Regions:
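Active-site metal-binding core of divalent-cation-utilizing nuclease and nuclease-like domains
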Residues: 56-107
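Charged, often low-complexity linker/regulatory segments
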Residues: 1-64, 229-267
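Charged, low-complexity C-terminal accessory regions
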Residues: 179-267
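Conserved catalytic cores of phosphodiester-cleaving nucleases, focusing on short active-site segments
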Residues: 91-93, 105-118, 136
C-alpha cells in the first residue's frame, strides 16, 4: 500500500546555528523526557541512524530530495479526534520526497527514558511502552515503534576497555589505517545491547519497531543504536492517513524538517 498527497506547505528550514526549540533549563537539568526527546531529534545524525533502523529499506531508497517531517509530543486526539489512549504521541514522523507526503510510511514512536547507572546496569525498566504502542496500532497508524533512550553516568576508568582508533584512507574502497589503541568507556554499548534484548524478549506484537539508543551527554560522542524494523500495520486505513495529512497541513510550522541529504549549494 502506498498513499501520497501533495505537501502543499513546508516548515521553515532550520540551518546550522538556528534556534529550533526553547527548552526550560529545569527540564534539561533533571533529564526530563520532553527535554531529552527534543534534544534527540535535534541531533540529526543520531536521529537518522535510529530512523534507518526502524524503517530499513525504505530509508535506504529515499532519494536526493527527501526527508522527514517530525512533530514531537502531540495530544493524540488532535490527530485522531476519537483517540483516547495513549493520550499523547511522542513523535509523529512523516517522510516526504519531491514535495509529496508519503503518508503510508508515517511512523509514530512511543518514547521511554531509561536512566541507568554503572552500579545498576542490570536493572529493568518499570515500563516498556508496549501498552501505548498497542494503542497506537489499534488506532491505525501505519508504522509504530517503541524507543528506549538511554542515559547513564560514567564507568570508573578501571572498567574502561582498549579500543582501536582507525583513520579512513579511502572512503570509496573502505580502506582504513589503524592509528593507536586508547581506553574508552564502552558501557553505552552494553546498555544498548542489554536494553534491546529486553525489548525483543518482551515485545507483544511483531509489527512494533524497537530501538535502543544511547544519548551521550557532554562530549561522549554518538553511539550507533540497536534496533528492529517496524512492520506495516494492517489496521491502517486511508481515513487515518488523511487525518495525519490534515493535522500536518494545519500545524506544518511546528514540524521539524530533517532532510536525508544536505541541501545542494547553488553557485
Amino acid at each position: 500500500m502506498e498513499y501520497k498527497l501533495p505537501m502543499k506547505v513546508k516548515p521553515p528550514v532550520k540551518k546550522d546555528g538556528d534556534i529550533i526549540f526553547h527548552i526550560d533549563v529545569k527540564l534539561v537539568n533533571k533529564a526530563d523526557e520532553i527535554a531529552l526527546g527534543l534534544q534527540y531529534i535535534c541531533n540529526r545524525y543520531l536521529y537518522g541512524q535510529g530512523y534507518r533502523k526502524l524503517m530499513g529499506d525504505f530509508f535506504d531508497k529515499m532519494g536526493l530530495h527527501s526527508g522527514t517531517l517530525i512533530k514531537p509530543f502531540i495530544i493524540s486526539s488532535h490527530v485522531i479526534p476519537q483517540m483516547s489512549f495513549p493520550g499523547d504521541i511522542d513523535f509523529l514522523i512523516i517522510p516526504y520526497e519531491n514535495d509529496q507526503l508519503i503518508l503510508s510510511k508515517a511512523l509514530v514512536i512511543e518514547l521511554k527514558i531509561i536512566r541507568a547507572k554503572f552500579i545498576k546496569q542490570q536493572k529493568s525498566p518499570n515500563e516498556y511502552g508496549f501498552s501505548q504502542a498497542k494503542g497506537l496500532i489499534e488506532s491505525g497508524f501505519p508504522y509504530v515503534a517503541v524507543m528506549h533512550l538511554i542515559i547513564s553516568d560514567e564507568s570508573p576508568q578501571s572498567h574502561w576497555r582498549d579500543v582501536l582508533i582507525a583513520k579512513v584512507v579511502d572512503a570509496k574502497s573502505g580502506k582504513i589505517e589503524l592509528i593507536e589503541t586508547i581506553k574508552k568507556d564502552m558501557m553505552p554499548i552494553s546498555l544498548m545491547e542489554r536494553g534491546f534484548g529486553r525489548l525483543v524478549h518482551n515485545c507483544p506484537d511483531e509489527r512494533i519497531g524497537l530501538l535502543a539508543t544511547y544519548f551521550a551527554q557532554e562530549k561522549a560522542g554518538n553511539w550507533l543504536p540497536c534496533g528492529k524494523e517496524a512492520k506495516f500495520n494492517d489496521k491502517c486505513t486511508v481515513g487515518i492517513l488523511d487525518k495525519i495529512a490534515e493535522y500536518y497541513y494545519q500545524n506544518y510550522t511546528t514540524f521539524l524538517d530533517t532532510r536525508k541529504y544536505p541541501p545542494i549549494k547553488k553557485d
